[in-house]
Each structure stands twice: as C-alpha cells, then as structure tokens.
C-alpha cells in the first residue's frame, strides 16, 4: 500500500468552489465550505455555554477569558472577528475548525484476475479522517472506475415447482454456455445454485399425506422452503450436474416462498461462498409471484423473520416452519448491507409485479428480465441484465440524518460539462472513470461524537471509509481546564470564563447567597407576569434582578426592571423612529417641541397650510398634521389641491367674467345696461393680450356674430379684485359663398343627369348589339325546306264529273 496522503484543510483559509482541474485530473481534494455571517450574540442566555455557542452556528466562537464582559456588556458568543475587536485574547477564543485528512489513497487498478494476489481497486480514496464542527460542511471528491475482469459471484436461485420442470432441464443444458458467456465479461467468474418451493404448511400445500409426499401430477419430491444445492465454484460441469440432479416438487397456491431463499442466500455467507471483493449476483428465476411478511400468519407462523442463516448440513432451511416470510424492507436492507445485485428472471405474466418490487428497492442494484416459458433465453437474459446493472453506478452510504450527519452528491458523470445533483451515473463501461463531489454536513449534535461512514457503489463491496469526529464540545470544558473553587466565582468553578456556582450560591459570579431560595425562585423575581419569560427573554436574571442583554448596535439599548423597554421599538414614519422628531422611550415617542402625533410626524404649526389669501386651507378645509383636509363644495363634491384651492364643479373665472366682457366691450350678451354697470371690474381693451404667466387665457364665441373673442384676467386673492384685458378685435369666420354653393349644386345635378343618360344609352346599345348578333347566328344556322311554297295557289282549277262513265264502245 503506498504511503498515505495527508491533506489538512482549515475553514477560514479555503474558498468554497472546487477548482476545475480537479475534475480533469481526478485528484482527491477536500474543501471546507466558507462560513456565513450569523447573529451569534442572540444565543439564549438560558443555555449560555461554550458548547451551546459553537453548536449554534458554524461562524460562532466563544471567548473564555475571565471578566471579559465585566467592563462592557459584550457577548461572549460572537464571531471571531467581533470577539477580537472587543478585546478577547486569541488564546481564549474557542472556534474549532473543520479539517479533512486523507489516510489511504491507493491508485485505481485493474489487477483483479484469478491468478493475481492483489485485488482490484475501483474507488479512490479508500479512507479519510474528518473533524467537523456543528452546522458546517466539508466537500471532497470520490472517483470510481470499473476494473477489467472484476470478480463476479453468480448464485442462481430457481423455483423448482412443477411448472418449472422444463426450465430446469433447459438450465442444465445451458450451464456451460452461461459460464462461457459470463467469462467474456470477466474471466474471474464463479457459479452457484439453490432452489426453493414454499413452506410445507397448509394452505400453501395440500394437507393430504399422499400429496405432501408427492404433490405433483407425476412422482416428485416433497416440498421444502429452500435448499442450497451448490456453493460458488468455477466448475461449470458440477453446476450442470447439480441442476440436473435437483428434484422438482410442488405447492398448492400460486405465490412461492422465494424471499426465504434470497434471505438465506445473503445471510449464509460462508456456506454460499461469497467473496468479499466481488460483485455478488443473485438470479431469481420463477414463473409465479411471491409470499412476503404476514402471509405466514395464514398457516399460524407469527414469528418474524430474523434475517440470519439457518441451513443444516444438507443445505435445507431449518426455520421455514417457524418464521414468517421476510418483509420487503428486510429484503431491501439485506441486499443493501451485503452489497448484492439481484436479477429477477420472471415470465411475461409476472413482469409488472416484479418491476414494482424492483422499484420498491431503492439504492440497490436490481433489474427485471422476461424469461421464456422454458428458460431458453436465460443466458442472454443474464448477460443483458448483468451489463445493465454493471453499467449503472449508484453511490450509497450509511449516513443517518437522525445522528446529525447528512451526505449529498453531485457529479458530471460521463458528459463532463454539467455538474448536477445526483448520486447515479449510467452508461459506465469497463475503464470509464466518473467522479462524485460529496458534501458532508453536520446538522446537530447528539451524545455520540465519533462515527464511521461508508460511501461506495451499490452492489459492490468497495467503500470509502470516512472516520468522522463531530466537534460539539469546547476544549475549555475539559475537566483539566476547569478552574475549581475560583475566587472570581466566590468559590464556584470557572468554566470557559463563566462561573458555575455550587453550595447554594447563585448569580453571575455566584455572589448571591439566598438561603432557602433556589435559582428557579430567583428567576421568578425576574418575570413581569407568571406567563412572561425571564427578563422578557432579553436579559439574564442575576440575584433576582434583570441584567439586560447588549445590542450589536451600541445606540440601541434595552432597559426597564424586566428589560421590557427599549429605544428602538417605537412607531416609525418614513422608516424613521419617531420621524427623527422625538425620542423613543419604552415603545412610545416623546416628541420634540413643535411636533406631535404617534410617531412625532405632525408639526403643531399651521404655516404649511396657509394659502395666498392668508386663509388656512383657502377657507375651504382644516389643517391636520401640517396638511389640508378639504371640505365638500356646495354641490357635494370635495375641494382639492394642496390648499383646497380647486373646486372641480364650480364655475371658473372665465365663465364668471364672460357676460361682463361681452356687454362692456361689444354691448352683446344677455346682460342689460344696468346689469353691465354692476360688473365688479372694467375691461381694458388692448390690441394684443399681454404674455403674463400668472394670467389665465379665456376664449368664447359671441352668439351675436359667431365671432371668437379673447381676454385675460388676473385675480388677486388678497384684495379680491380682478383685472381683465380684452382683445379689441374678434376672430370672425369668413362669409358663406351662397351663390357659389347654389350654382355648384345645380351644376352637379345637371352633370349627374347627363351621366345617367349616357349610361342608359350605353346599356341600350350593348343590348341591341347582343340581340342582333343572336339573330345573325340563328339565320346562318337555319335549314329551309325545298318543297313548294305552302301559300302559293295555281291559276287554274280542274273539276271532274262524278257521273261520267267514259267513251261508249
């Protein structure tokens, strides 16, 4: 074995990510994940010890210096940087570091041939030592490479009920071919054989004596639970002979007792002959279903299966009548613990059942193959399913979350591009190398401190052994570091800078001697009510009096007899405590002069509400908290604007001054002369309106001449006077051309009539031409009769005498 490689990694010195070169070279690396910031000072004072501190968070450290928190109320539990900043000597800081040390790291090798003394190495490294503190993580790489000619032990478990008679014969004939085919996969191959029927109990078998002796239609052997027929060997001729010699039997119900056989094949390691460093294969061949835990109760068997070996000298399972069938959970655990691989070779009608069984066995290597009715395809099936199992690697471990240890995996598998969360890689051929990034995390502490983790591929007895020590305790808590009968603790013991009182004394420095009063009784004096926490959970009870915890921000202080008050939990305005216009005192704001309100957000002065006319909120509202709250207008709508100067439905000054402008400048509009004289202003006629920003432009149409007139006004709210400028000239529309419109209409009508006549003429011409063309076509196609004219009459008429008899002889 080459010398061990040692790699020590401290959490404060190493980065988070693994370098890319690690994936390319396959070198083993270890990384401690960087610490994150955490408010360690919030550790509960009810359990304020060094070990509780380092277990609180990975970034928490403890200052064990005596009297460290005497002058200033600094927290002993804080980050290392904060403790040093507050003056804690480095030698007194308890901050255990996570480290990783690789103790065995042999190279991957293919030396697994039969004649080789050395065993193949498929996983790297082989052993490491990790010290990990609570709530921290450490990462390392595990490399796997499938070796050439890795040893394979194949144990064939066959259902020898009567329906499998032809299958037994075919297996006997194919024994040599099976061994020959498997040796093309690996030269280091051994073969074993066992058989099973069912429990020899009713209702699983026929209770009649003659049927118990020979349950088959033709003579056959008595039923049995399981029989080990042949141990693992390279002698294939013996395998063929043992299969041929094995006797067929039978049972009554359809399911078989195959689970008993699997458990015994796994439990009887020496009898079967399993090698420690070999791929253990069990081929489970049947044409029926299976019995499992609970079925034995039908026959009165209630004792659970213990999962241990019970074979006699002849290889028979001796507890078949005493123990129930194994549960699927027991089957899964034994396959996982023994690092075995199972191939279920079943007939087509049972494929779905055994596929469900295979899926119920997580993190173990199992597969299902369809067996021909006479098992003629058994060789191809085993070869195919073996390759399927061997080409898939599942990384498994024995980490127990309840013990505070958690392992997670990431890998690029064979694509080498994307690192993904998985513990499974597929398509692994002989010589292929895959790497897994493993993260070990401690989530909490238990009484146990030392653990042995085993990480390795499912179905292989090769593992990485990780010896783990969880750093849940501080060195200053060791017995040889405790200062007993310390003067600083008034005779108590000083542990990590904190006094541990004895002899009835209590208090921070054991200075309280209250005969007849327990610490619990003193703690009751530090509660505001019976239901309250001690010092409201924000301080410690010292001799029956509360000492409030310090805050990380020195400007924030907790106070009060029971630490019920502070200066940072008051109402805020714009995210500012008391709007920065007062002081926070025990949850209430004490406002500075000139300010009021729950959060001192309201000025007492109403200056901010004064409008230009000197009225508060323009006389249309009230000033509340420095802002105008407007009243409703006479029509029920609310005034608006910063000073309530806007009335959405009130008439504007433009509309109000319109009639006065019309009557004064042009003597038009609805006002008579008397009403016009009563207008509150006199217009100022100008050629062009002045360009003043503070004036409001107005324009209206005079109904008398349909001309638009313009004027500007300025209203002085202070004096309630208006100044109005009006432009002398109106903008009148041009006169309507009546004659042109009439002539245009007449011309349009005439032209339209002419166009209609022309259109009518065009249509008639086209129609006549069509009729004439039709007539010519009919004339040319006509065929006239050549007889006489039917209306022609000749000029002469001949009459014959009807009584004329002719000439006499």
Curated annotation (Swiss-Prot):
Annotated I-EGF domain residues: 476-511, 512-564, 565-601, 602-645
Span of the signal peptide: 1-19
Membrane-topology annotation of the record: Single-pass type I membrane protein
SMART domains listed in its UniProt record: INB (SM00187), Integrin_b_cyt (SM01241), Integrin_B_tail (SM01242)
Glycosylation sites (chain numbering): 47, 141, 269, 373, 400, 530, 672, 693, 721
Modification after translation, per record: Phosphorylated. Dephosphorylated by dep-1.
Presence of keyword Lipoprotein: no
UniProt cross-references to Pfam families, sorted A to Z: EGF_2 (PF07974), EGF_integrin (PF23105), Integrin_b_cyt (PF08725), Integrin_B_tail (PF07965), Integrin_beta (PF00362), PSI_integrin (PF17205)
GO BP term, pick one: regulation of vulval development
Molecular function, one GO term: integrin binding
Inactivation phenotype: RNAi-mediated knockdown in distal tip cell (DTC) causes DTC migration and guidance defects during the second phase of gonad elongation resulting in a triangular shaped gonad. Embryos at the comma and 1.5-fold stages have increased number of cell corpses. RNAi-mediated knockdown causes an accumulation in the proximal gonad of endomitotic mature oocytes. RNAi-mediated knockdown results in increased mobility of let-23 receptor on the plasma membrane of vulval cells resulting in enhanced activity of the signaling pathway.
Transmembrane domains' residue ranges: 738-758
GO cellular component, one term: basolateral plasma membrane
The keyword DNA damage belongs to this UniProt entry's keyword annotation: no
Modified residues (Phosphotyrosine): 792
Tissue note: Expressed in body wall muscles (at protein level). Expressed in gonadal sheath cells and spermatheca. Expressed in vulval cells and along the basal laminae that separate the vulval cells from the uterus (at the protein level).
Residue numbers on the Cytoplasmic membrane side: 759-809
Subcellular localization, as worded in the UniProt entry: Cell membrane; Lateral cell membrane; Basolateral cell membrane; Cytoplasm, Myofibril, Sarcomere, M line
UniProt cross-references to Gene3D superfamilies, sorted A to Z: 4.10.1240.30, Cytochrome c1, transmembrane anchor, C-terminal, Laminin, ligand-binding face of the semaphorins, domain 2, ntegrin, alpha v. Chain A, domain 3, von Willebrand factor, type A domain
Extracellular side, ranges: 20-737
PANTHER family, sorted: INTEGRIN BETA SUBUNIT (PTHR10082), INTEGRIN BETA-PS (PTHR10082:SF60)
Similarity remark: Belongs to the integrin beta chain family.
Quaternary structure note: Heterodimer of an alpha and a beta subunit. Interacts with alpha subunit ina-1. Interacts with alpha subunit pat-2. Component of an integrin containing attachment complex, composed of at least pat-2, pat-3, pat-4, pat-6, unc-52, unc-97 and unc-112. May interact with tns-1 (via C-terminus).
Protein task: Integrin alpha ina-1/beta pat-3 is a receptor for laminin. Integrin alpha pat-2/beta pat-3 recognizes the sequence R-G-D in its ligands. Plays a role in cell migration, morphogenesis and probably in cell-cell interactions. During gonad morphogenesis, involved in distal tip cell (DTC)-mediated guidance of gonad elongation, in maintaining their sharp tapering morphology and in their migration. Component of an integrin containing attachment complex, which is required for muscle development and maintenance.
Name of the molecule in the record: Integrin beta pat-3
Organism this protein belongs to: Caenorhabditis elegans
High-level lineage: Eukaryota, Metazoa, Ecdysozoa, Nematoda, Chromadorea
